[in-house]
Amino acid sequence: MLALYTLGLFILTAVTEIVGCYLPYLWLKKSAPGWVLLPAAASLAMFAWLLSLHPTDAGRVYAAYGGVYVFVALLWLWGVEGVRPHPWDFVGVAVALAGMGIIMFAPRG
């Protein structure tokens, strides 16, 4: 159950980080209105708070989180931006998620 909780928390954390960064991108590059910076700031604050909820040491969380971030970012690319990832992108995601699994769930002696 801890693994499902951790994975779900990583996914939610990644979504809040991506939203918090994508909205300023829209403002800077796509002429979105300035008010989009308010939900962006709230999303990034939530991202930082969510990182504090993970059930292990901060450095390990940050290292493992990167693998899930890569996965969610490619889903964002596909679902939000409408760009289909290249097959090699999926290979990279698999490697990143394998690394996340090792970092988070390998037995510690």
From Swiss-Prot:
Topological category with respect to the lipid bilayer: Multi-pass membrane protein
GO cellular component, one term: plasma membrane
Pfam families associated with the record: UPF0060
Claim: Lipid biosynthesis is one of the keywords in the record: no
Source superkingdom: Bacteria
Primary residence: membrane
Record flagged with keyword Membrane: yes
Annotated TM spans: 1-21, 33-53, 63-83, 87-107
Subcellular location: Cell inner membrane
Family annotation (HAMAP family): UPF0060
Family statement: Belongs to the UPF0060 family.
NCBIfam families: PRK02237.1
Listed name of the protein: UPF0060 membrane protein ABO_1373
